[in-house]
Amino acid sequence: KKTLSLEKGLAVDTFQTHLKFGWGDKNFFLRTKEWSDMEVGTVLNTVFGRGPGAMHLILCTPKDLDPKSMVEVKVSKSQYQRLCAFIQCSFRFENGKAKMIEHHPYGTYDFFFDSPIEYNMTYTCNTWTNNALKRAGQKACVWTPFKGAIFSKYAVRSSQK
């Protein structure tokens, strides 16, 4: 049985009630905590190269969430289970446990895990998100390396407000 073992491996307190998942280029994650940390070599390798992927988990509070950069997606129980299965397949497991990346420049509530999925210019973080939505039976693009196309699927038209 594969498990993320989050309840034993993450520093949790009573204020961190939400968990954000993301997938992306491992080297970019580990070298670019802030946009000001960005280096030309890292960007070029991320855009034009191929490299290992990583999962990024962030424990947060509701006030840490920016509603302007989020959309609500309602899912059924079976859609939720399919989404969780997709996310779980994005972790590399060793001896049944997700392989955590121990050293990174982020904070106490950030966690990184190795992923078996390779990052490249045709499979980006936005492609991963789009595929997660597809797996959950939600609106998604045929393919997208950019977030704008995904968000446009969930845009509220002025006539619907």
Each predicted region: which residue ranges?
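Second-shell loop/turn segments in exported
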Residues: 66-76, 111-120
